[in-house]
Amino acid sequence: LYPISTGRNLAYGGSAPVHSGSVVLDLKRMNRVLEVDERNAYALVEPGVSYFDLYNYIQERGIDVWIDPPDPGWGSVIGNALDGGGGWTAYPYRDHFGAHCGMEVVLGDGDIVRTGMGAVPNAKTWQENKWGYGPWVDGLFRQGNMGVVTKMGFWLMPRPEAYISGTARVMNDEGAIGLMDTLNHLENLHIVNGSTQLGGGGGGAGFGGGAGWSLQVPIYGPPDVIRAQLAYARSKFEQIEGCTFTESEMIMTPAPGEEPPPGVRLVNFGIPDLSTFSMLGRSPFQPNPAGGHIGFSPILPRRGEELIRFRDWYQANASEVSGGENLGIVGPVFMTNWERSLVGLIMFPVSKDPAHNEKIRDAFVRWVELAAAEGWAEYRAPTVYQDLIARTYSFNDNALTRMREKIKDAVDPNGIISAGRYGVWPKHLRDA
């Protein structure tokens, strides 16, 4: 069995099983929102509930909380969290697995388990305390194949009153080191709580392009508070030599049932949509768009020196890896929306040309190998490369994978759930 729900896992292999011949278990019809508690700001949902579904449920009832949507609003709230996805509002809510609290799982042997406080009959705090008693097992089901998750709780964000942002700009790489150090300081103090965006750096190293670097820092909260937080952030960034800082107008957030302000990016206001997919659509500027892309997403230390080293490493190796051809690979784009680390995203286009796609596949494998040699590894992987990337987590003769296999054999003795997902195979298929 290979469980899926409403999401499509775009850029990471789609909804296809890892193991050929698997039976796809579609959970879309398990689509109930079981509870939304406004006073303690949490939801309990089934796997067929999409971000659109949960948003509409909240709006229709006038509940004054936000969800944290990723780019694909059609995606499953549970599925996105289990695959390690994230969103675009405030931390910690945009770390979707990190913001979950309690789950119900059907194991491979048919046993039904509730994690955390949910293991207590008639539990009153299942969605309010994630740890419960004894070893915490929820992580076994993130990118896992130990069972089928049938319910999951999530902490929601009380609607903040207002939103404001500032943008710090530097003109050289030395300034980027200061940007990262200052961002770390501000986020670790929870002064900047929104999903930041880094651009620039030259060589396609961000959405902004150009030789300099820019960093947008959004903040959510009460107007007087966030105005003071932004002023403090500005004072810190302006200590970087040559740094300029501009501020946006404050935006008051819409109450349930109100229209969002014009021109805003909806996902930054807890509103799911699909606008990001327009970049893949046909237009006068892009008459023959690619058929999609696959993402290479290594995790990097949140330091300016490492950001620059990754960019230079990519540029130094790009021609050799692509065989001297322009394969349309885009990157690196540096994502700063995970606290305490960076993602050095590289996007590989998928086309209707089999020969081109074969070159893309070869280039992807080579980038994985080169990155692993530098100590950089991915946090998420397209289906076809999950074994390859699992092998880069090889400390002590692959001890982590061996431990996962032992647990897999214990809770799914017949190996029937999602064989091979994220490099974990059941006993009867390990050497197949």
In which residue ranges do the predicted regions lie?
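C-terminal cap/substrate-recognition region of VAO/PCMH-type FAD-linked oxidoreductases
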Residues: V137, G153-F154, I164-G175, L179-L274
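Conserved glycine-rich FAD pyrophosphate-binding loop
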Residues: L1-G7, A11-K28, C243-A432
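Residues forming anionic-ligand binding surfaces in small-molecule and nucleic-acid pockets
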Residues: N31-E38, T150-A162, G210, R282-S297
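Generic secondary-structure signature for well-ordered alpha-helical cores
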Residues: Q59-I63, V105-I112, F154, G175-V192, ...
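Glycine-rich, charged/polar anion/phosphate-binding loops
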Residues: G87-P92, A123-K124, G132-F141, K151-G153, ...
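Short, conserved charged micro-motifs
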Residues: D53, D173-M180, P223-Y232, E305-F310, ...
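FAD-binding subdomain of flavoenzyme oxidoreductases
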Residues: V33-V36, L44-L183, A432
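Flexible loop/turn segments at secondary-structure boundaries
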Residues: N9-G13, Y51-D53, W74-S76, N122, ...
